[in-house]
């Protein structure tokens, strides 16, 4: 089922800019979501990073609508007076009728204006509004589902606010209301039921039923067409939530999803084909290290190494300079996030490294928040021992240095037998004795509340990865979000990612996947799957993703065992790379950040808003989509500088020199010439394929007149890439060649 986008990103370096043709002077955008200034999940990141781009387009006519939370307002919002008379009258009217509505500025980049609705203060109207929802939409909400009840309150308050704003506006604006996820979907349904003159958009970032089915060990993607959705939702006691989500999808003027894979899922589960796919982006400037990300990687890796020294005290029998750091992070959904596949692949990798006598060691981190009651005592002790050893070494070093200085000052060579006295040797022996431990280093850094049934810990027991000296793969489960104030691993998430070598995200259900995207913009290679939105997006736009450090694991057309074997192959091949090859690969990975910038991906949202305006106000706006063939898009070519496969890339000399491994000097090519990052970056960017089609979406406004420009066709440089761009995978059901 091909699902072409109605707008292409045509402004990557070397391509023409796409100009906005709509007159938005008398248009207002309200973006409604439960995670406005309220961090719960990934939608918070979407709104936070997209705010600046949307604000640049809409200016002061852009508002975010979300729930009022005391914690969120205290730490993220500056309360202000309403900037316009119409908005002030709207807030005053609602507050005078028993609601509590707050207005302010979200303290993030772009500083968007926010309207916060106090859901708890309106609980007095819950039963009446639930009755109205039943009469209007035939959706009943049980009393015990607090989240669904909050969705009802939030939806009615949002509709009340939009209706009041339209009533209080002297010059009736063209209002666009963009609703994210089912928690905000009730408001969309009510806007259509009450016939408010509002252009509505509904974006689902993941379907409710899809997430529940995948978590239940169901062969989800092979049975999408066969599910009895009402029966499945009812058995999982989420039928009322499913009805809210499905109603919002059908009521919206424009329905969007975040990825091609989720679009197919939504068509079968929600019974509506999305109008457009709106991929998630990132604020790339935030992660830009100005060509210093290699140095930042080294600095962050040193912080991780300090933790490893303490965690493995007494068993630090591996070379930290030959140690790679892998990690998986995200919501603790054991099978959905692919932690089961990752653990199995680590066990197989451990076997391969041992039987092949590899000197490489892998430390795999699992950063997934779970229920804990405290830090593990052994883990805390390890960091304390490490700090004590450091203090002891510094004390001895100072005494040694002072005696050496005094000896040289009088013009004689020091007597090495007198440099350290008996007290110094006693101190060092005590330090060595403190590093002795009988048990293996702990697998988990915290005390788990359900240790016996925790899926990660039970799997580790089954595969036998206990951090023994014989293991080449070590496992560390950190069941808590990373923080720079932690007494164990005092780094924030961004710094931790920069210090690792590879992010592993073998997800079975991942509508988009921000974690591999964040790795990409920070120049860290990652493993994703062809069942994640990010993985499909990269396969579509990159001719050879693995050459750029984006490994795509096949979890669609392979069995679970075959997927584990493929992941093991990826991991083992990565371990075989030299430091030089990893540096080159990180340079290429960071170069892909342009693909994920909201500056370009935000245009999908722009297209969705234009489509909604043309459907809601056809007398004022027209939208003429010009669908292009999927194969006419652009693709990053395969890099021509160095073969991406470690097995095909050899050193120019039997042993690497220190100069060769220094990232500041740049790695050497096969012919001995220095690898130039800037030159390679320019070469790759020159060879981005230009689209050979007229602009896909042509929008006109009756108020501003019609103006249509076609994108000039650009020619790409001739590299050793295929003469014709490869077409992206159009459907999950199609076999790949």
From Swiss-Prot:
Low complexity biased stretches: 715-737
Biased-composition ranges, Polar residues, are 698-714
GO CC, sorted alphabetically, is: cytoplasm; cytosol; inclusion body; membrane
**Could you say which residues bind UDP here?**
39, 331, 515
* Pathway this chain belongs to: Glycan biosynthesis; glycogen biosynthesis
List residues modified as Phosphothreonine: 700, 721
Listed CDD domains = GT3_GSY2-like (cd03793)
Bias-annotated ranges (Acidic residues)? 658-681
Q: List-wise, which residues carry Phosphoserine?
A: 8, 11, 412, 641, 645, 649, 652-653, 657, 698, 710, 727, 731
Protein family membership: Belongs to the glycosyltransferase 3 family.
Per the entry, what this protein does is:
Glycogen synthase participates in the glycogen biosynthetic process along with glycogenin and glycogen branching enzyme. Extends the primer composed of a few glucose units formed by glycogenin by adding new glucose units to it. In this context, glycogen synthase transfers the glycosyl residue from UDP-Glc to the non-reducing end of alpha-1,4-glucan.
Subunit structure, interactors included: Part of the GYS1-GYG1 complex, a heterooctamer composed of a tetramer of GYS1 and 2 dimers of GYG1, where each GYS1 protomer binds to one GYG1 subunit (via GYG1 C-terminus); the GYS1 tetramer may dissociate from GYG1 dimers to continue glycogen polymerization on its own.
Protein name in UniProt: Glycogen [starch] synthase, muscle
Which species is this record about? Homo sapiens
């Amino acid at each position: 089922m091909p699902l072409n986008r109605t707008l292409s990103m045509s402004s990557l370096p070397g391509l023409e800019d796409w100009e906005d043709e709509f007159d938005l002077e008398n248009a207002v955008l309200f973006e409604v979501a439960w995670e406005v200034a309220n961090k719960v999940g990934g939608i918070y990141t979407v709104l936070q990073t997209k705010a600046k781009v949307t604000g640049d387009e809409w200016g002061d006519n852009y508002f975010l609508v979300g729930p009022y939370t005391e914690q969120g307002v205290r730490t993220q919002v500056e309360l202000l007076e309403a900037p316009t008379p119409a908005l002030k009258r709207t807030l005053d009217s609602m507050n005078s009728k028993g609601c509590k509505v707050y207005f302010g500025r979200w303290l993030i980049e772009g500083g968007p204006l926010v309207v916060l609705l106090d859901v708890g203060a309106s609980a007095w109207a819950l039963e009446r509004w639930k009755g109205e929802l039943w009469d209007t939409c035939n959706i009943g909400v049980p009393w015990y589902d607090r989240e669904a009840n909050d969705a009802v309150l939030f939806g009615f308050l949002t509709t009340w606010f939009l209706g009041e704003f339209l009533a209080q506006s002297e010059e009736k604006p063209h209002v666009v209301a963009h609703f994210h996820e089912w928690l905000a979907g009730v408001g969309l349904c009510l806007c259509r039921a009450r016939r408010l003159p509002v252009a509505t958009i509904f974006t689902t970032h993941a379907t409710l039923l899809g997430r529940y089915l995948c978590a239940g060990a169901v062969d989800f993607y092979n049975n999408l067409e066969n599910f009895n959705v009402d029966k499945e939702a009812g058995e999982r006691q989420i039928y009322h939530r499913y009805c809210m989500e499905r109603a919002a999808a059908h009521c919206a003027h424009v329905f969007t999803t975040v990825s091609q894979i989720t679009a197919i899922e939504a068509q079968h589960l929600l019974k509506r084909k999305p109008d457009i796919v709106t991929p998630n982006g990132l604020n790339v400037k935030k992660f830009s290290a100005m060509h210093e990300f290699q140095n930042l990687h080294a600095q962050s890796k040193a912080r991780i190494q300090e933790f490893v020294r303490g965690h493995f005290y007494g068993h630090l029998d591996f070379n930290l300079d030959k140690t790679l750091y892998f990690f998986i992070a995200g919501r603790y959904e054991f099978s959905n996030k692919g932690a089961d596949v990752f653990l199995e692949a680590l066990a197989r990798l451990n076997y391969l490294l041992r039987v092949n006598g590899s000197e490489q060691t892998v430390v795999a981190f699992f950063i997934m928040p779970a229920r804990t009651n405290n830090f593990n005592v052994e883990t805390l002790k390890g960091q304390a021992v490490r700090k004590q050893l450091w203090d002891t070494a510094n004390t001895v070093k100072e005494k040694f240095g002072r005696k050496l200085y005094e000896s040289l000052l009088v013009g004689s060579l020091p007597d090495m037998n007198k440099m350290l006295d008996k007290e110094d040797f006693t101190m060092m022996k005590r330090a060595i004795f403190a590093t002795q431990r009988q048990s293996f280093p702990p697998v988990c850094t915290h005390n788990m509340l359900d240790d016996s049934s925790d899926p990660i810990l039970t799997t580790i027991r089954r595969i036998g990865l206990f951090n023994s000296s014989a293991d080449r793969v070590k496992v560390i489960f950190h069941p808590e979000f990373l923080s720079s104030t932690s007494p164990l691993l005092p780094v924030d998430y961004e710094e931790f990612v920069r210090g690792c070598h590879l992010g592993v995200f073998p997800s079975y259900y991942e509508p988009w996947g921000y974690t591999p995207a964040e790795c990409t913009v920070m120049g860290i290679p990652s493993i994703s799957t062809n069942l994640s939105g990010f993985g499909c997006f990269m396969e579509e736009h990159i001719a050879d993703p693995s050459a750029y450090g984006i490994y795509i694991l096949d979890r669609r057309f392979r069995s679970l065992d075959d997927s584990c074997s493929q992941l093991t192959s990826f991991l083992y091949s990565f371990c075989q790379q030299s430091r030089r090859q990893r540096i080159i690969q990180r340079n290429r990975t960071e170069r892909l950040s342009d693909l994920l910038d909201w500056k370009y991906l935000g245009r999908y949202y722009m297209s969705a808003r234009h489509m909604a305006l043309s459907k809601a106000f056809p007398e004022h706006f027209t939208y003429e989509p010009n669908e292009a063939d999927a194969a006419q898009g652009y693709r990053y070519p395969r890099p021509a500088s160095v073969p991406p496969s470690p097995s095909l890339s050899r050193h120019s000399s039997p042993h690497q020199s220190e100069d060769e491994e220094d990232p500041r000097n740049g790695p050497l090519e096969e012919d001995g010439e220095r690898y130039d990052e800037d030159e390679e970056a320019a070469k790759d960017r020159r060879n981005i394929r230009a689209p050979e089609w007229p602009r896909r979406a042509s929008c006109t406004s009756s108020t501003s007149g019609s103006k249509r420009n076609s994108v000039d066709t650009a020619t790409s440089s001739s590299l050793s890439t295929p003469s014709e761009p490869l077409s992206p995978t159009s459907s999950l059901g199609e076999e790949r060649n």
